[in-house]
Amino acid sequence: MVPEQIDLIKESWAKVVPIKEAAADLFYDRLFELDPTIRPLFKKDLTEQKRKLVAMLNRIVALLGDFGALVHMAEDLGRRHVQYGVEAKHYDTVGAALLWTLRTGLGAAFTPEVEAAWTAAYRTLAGAMKEAAYGVPASAMKKAA
């Protein structure tokens, strides 16, 4: 990621924070719409999970300038998520739900440049998470799928 992309993510995230509860609702609604088989991985009441999602995204955005810390955090997150039953195939669905949520929440502010920045960030994070969780580089997983 280049500095301009980091700036775009930080600027766009600042616009999401005031609507964070609605954004979390949109995200989980879309996630379960895209893949209903993911729903059983979560508790019935998503209140705490939604809070954790927003807190994690806040942390990710804050760490964007520190690539080493960001990757370390993503690796730890990946190892934890595999224990919850998350499979490698779920990462694409989560990414699609995240981008859809940002597009819906930001409207016209979700420009192609903003989308490219968020896509690059998500690919980096998801790649580090999958590698830590499954011990296989993300590039090798794509080839196997």
Regions found by a protein language model. Give the residues of each.
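Globin-like tetrapyrrole-binding proteins
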Residues: 1-145
